[in-house]
Design a protein with these regions (language model features):
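Hydrophobic alpha-helical segments and their helix-loop junctions in multi-pass secondary transporters
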Residues: 129, 160-164, 168-177, 305-328, ...
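A generic transmembrane alpha-helix motif of multi-pass inner-membrane proteins
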Residues: 494-496, 506-529, 551-668, 715
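Membrane-embedded translocation segments of transport machinery
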Residues: 43-79, 86, 290, 294-459, ...
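Transmembrane helix-loop boundary segments of multi-pass membrane transporters
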Residues: 103-121, 137-141, 148, 291-300, ...
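Transmembrane helix-boundary motif of multi-pass solute transporters/channels
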Residues: 84-120, 131-132, 281, 286-292, ...
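Membrane-interface "cap" regions at the ends of multi-pass membrane proteins
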Residues: 2-100, 129-134, 192, 201-204, ...
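Hydrophobic, membrane-embedded alpha-helices of multi-pass small-molecule transporters
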Residues: 87-97, 155, 212, 225, ...
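Extracellular/lumenal N-termini and interhelical loops of multi-pass eukaryotic membrane proteins
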Residues: 163-263, 321-334, 405-428, 520-522, ...
């Protein structure tokens, strides 16, 4: 009984194993037949004689995600959300240039009238180039070129030095009294003067004498003692003769500035440590690429805007601030007849939007392929205008308050661009506020966030470009490339911590992010509009956002004709009005101007140099090399196959099997020769759609029409 039962069990197990072997053999045969079949894996054959297909799913690859739940590009990555992308782009465009250049241009170029050429240049030059860069980055999902890469490196090196200054100020603001609020420090000179309207009134009420250092001497015996013998009486504040304590603190204590460019001096190790902290923050923010950077902007960008608004409201409550706003924003319409004003407006538009620095291309390259970047450009442009106006209002209210305190007419106040405005004028106004250290901490936190929000994405531009150039070796080692680049840039930035560092920083800022960006914009616009084809580019935009940007003819004319002409006009304005530049009272020598021109022309020289290298590496006769040089690379287009299949289905292996004829003597599963009748009788499946919208029932691929190369690409 037990024997028969065990024998029956063995029989059933052997039958089961036999059936399993038959099923596995059948499955392997079916897989082999399916692999040799002409039908793609995402389609199911309905009838061999009438080849029609139904979709069983999207084309999927191990590096792609089509369910909108994760990253589309599993290798390169994408933004976690559209909010991350928009805040990052907003933080990138809200650079320090908006704060330290726009108010100055309004001051010298017609006050409120300057906003008119600024808006015009934004519309006809800034907006089109921003749209072009966002579209290029999102379409190709790759990094930038060599010329833009070099400019990005220079900007990143010296801009992080400004962040180091802000960190130095931040740490020294954690005191009960701000060190730049008085003239009693060891770094102050005889010309340092403190003038406070309330202190003067109190001193006069007590029949006292106000000294340069801001102290009031009531007793005449005290006035003639040894401590006050070297101090003169301050009867009024003369801007040309007296120096604000914030200016001496910045030049003598923070920078330890020398008297000329070639007097390097020693390294200020306090600044070197602050610079190291700035680069460590950049490394931590970009440790996980755009994933971590996208989260940092939630704090950095939003906090910067909140602090900017809070400081503006606080300064607006002070006496004289409203007079400053009225004075500086009062339009002087005759300035619009000066072409220099229009050139300055165009330069400021490029500087404010951070165009042609590569950051916008990199930010857009991490977006999803079908993100509506047409909506993004309007959001960024409106935010840029509002931010510029708010930054100008902050500066003008501070200047009005300072002029009231110093009893100086507003039109006599010497407003200067650059570090003078950010690290001298505004800190001087903040030092006169009640509980000044709290506002100083807020202000320098804002400056640090503004600078790092820009430099971290410039840094990501550099790192991603290097990784995209060598994807097999470096893309999986993004952090190593980031660490090495941060260390290299820190080493290159240490010379800016010397006594002559401010002179070199001003030189780099004067020559790098100005007219070279306009030249890059010109070549970029010409290459896209005239070489690649503006119609092709607009088709690519439609491919991504599923409609042509309205109005179609406007963008076509802008990119093809207006933008190149505007860029050439801007260059002529800038170059014709060029004069040797200065910092404070120091005039740069001729050799320094030559060095600046060399630094500015080096990235521009990379454009013809790289073209020459490409031409020499090409094969064939001269006309063929020239043609190949002007044609896109074979891998140009969307990075993911799922997106290429939307417009060029024959480029994708699975889609190619769907549309191209199968090899000769191919049999279906029922043994019928699907190639019976020859290639001339082969028609596309009725549901297979080509890039021009025609279906298989409407087009026939002839052997005479497709060359062997065309059978492989079929574009």
């Amino acid at each position: 009984m037990s024997f028969s039962s065990s024998q029956g069990g063995d029989t059933r197990r052997s039958q089961t194993r036999s059936v399993s072997r038959q099923e596995s053999a059948a499955a392997s045969d079916s897989k082999r037949d399916f692999a040799d079949s002409v039908y793609p894996p995402f389609c199911k054959k309905l009838d061999v004689d009438l080849p029609e297909f139904i979709r069983e799913g999207d084309i999927e690859y191990p590096f792609e995600d089509t369910d909108d739940l994760g990253d589309e590009n599993k290798i390169r990555g994408n933004w976690s959300s559209r909010i991350d992308y928009l805040l990052s782009a907003l933080g990138f465009t809200f650079g320090i240039g908006t704060l330290w250049r726009f108010p100055y241009y309004c001051h010298i170029y017609g006050g409120g009238a300057f906003i008119v050429p600024y808006l015009v240049m934004l519309f006809i030059a800034g907006l089109p180039i921003v749209f072009m860069e966002l579209a290029l980055g999102q379409f190709a999902s790759i990094g930038i070129g060599v010329a833009t890469l070099l400019i990005s490196c220079i900007i990143c090196i010296y801009m992080n030095m400004v962040a180091a200054w802000s960190i130095f100020y931040f740490t020294n603001s954690m005191k009960f009294a701000l060190p730049w609020a008085a003239c009693t420090n060891e770094w102050n000179t005889f010309n340092c003067s403190v003038w406070n309207r309330d202190s003067v009134s109190k001193c006069v009420a007590h029949n006292g004498t106000l000294l340069r250092n801001g102290s009031c001497v009531v007793n005449k015996a005290d006035f003639f003692n040894d401590d006050n013998a070297s101090l003169s009486v301050l009867t009024s504040f003369d801007i040309s003769a007296n120096v604000m304590p914030s200016a001496e603190y910045f030049h003598h204590e923070v920078l330890m500035m020398s008297d000329r460019l070639d007097n390097v001096g020693t390294i200020n190790w306090q600044l070197a440590i602050c610079l190291l902290i700035a680069w460590l923050l950049i490394f931590l923010f970009l440790f996980k690429g755009v994933k971590s950077a996208g989260k940092v902007v939630y704090v950095g960008v939003l906090a910067a805007y909140v602090i900017l608004f809070v400081l503006f409201v606080r300064l607006l409550t002070l006496p004289g601030s409203l007079s400053g706003l009225i004075h500086f924003y009062t339009p002087r319409w005759n300035a619009l007849y000066d072409l220099t004003v229009w050139g300055g407006a165009a330069v400021q538009v490029f500087y404010s939007l951070s165009s042609c620095t590569g950051g916008l291309i990199t930010l857009a390259s991490y977006s999803r392929f079908h993100n509506n970047m047409f909506k993004d450009i309007w959001l960024l442009s409106i935010a840029d205008v509002l931010t510029s106006i708010l930054a100008g209002a902050l500066v003008y209210s501070a200047v009005g308050f300072m002029c009231y305190e110093m009893d100086v007419p507003i039109d006599q106040f010497q407003l200067k661009a650059g570090a003078h405005l950010v690290f001298i004028v505004l800190p001087e106004a903040i030092a006169k506020l009640p509980v000044a250290p709290i506002y100083a901490l807020m202000y320098f936190v804002m400056i640090v966030f503004i600078i790092l929000s820009t430099t971290m994405f410039v840094m990501e531009t550099i790192v991603s470009s290097i990784c995209d150039e060598f994807p097999e070796r470096l893309r999986r080692n993004h952090r190593h490339v980031l660490a090495f680049t941060c260390l290299a840039f820190y080493s290159l930035g240490v010379p800016l911590c010397t006594a002559a560092g401010i002179y070199w920083l001003v030189l780099l800022d004067h020559f790098t992010p100005t007219w070279p960006l306009i030249i890059l914009a010109f070549f970029e616009c010409m290459a896209v509009s005239w070489v690649y084809g503006v119609d092709n580019f607009l088709d690519n935009i439609k491919w991504m956002i599923r409609f042509y940007p309205p109005p179609y003819i406007f963008w076509k004319i802008q990119w093809k004709f207006i933008c190149p002409l505007v860029f050439l006009m801007i260059l002529s304005f800038v170059w014709v009005g060029y004069s040797p530049f200065t910092y404070e009272d120091y005039e740069y020598p001729e050799w320094a101007n030559s060095v600046g021109w060399g630094i500015a022309l080096t990235p521009i020289a990379m454009i013809p140099l790289c073209a020459l290298v490409k031409f020499c590496r090409a094969r064939g006769p001269f006309p063929q090399r020239w043609r190949d040089l002007l044609c896109p690379e074979d891998d140009w287009g969307p990075a993911l196959a799922i997106h290429r299949a939307e417009y060029y289905p024959l480029q994708i292996p699975e889609a190619r099997r769907l549309i191209l004829p199968p090899p000769p003597n191919s049999k279906g599963t029922n043994g019928v020769d699907v190639m019976a009748g020859g290639l001339e009788d082969y028609s596309l499946p009725s549901k297979a759609t080509l890039s021009d919208g025609t279906t298989g029932s409407n087009r026939v691929l002839k052997a005479s029409f497709l060359s062997p190369f065309d059978r492989e690409t079929a574009i």
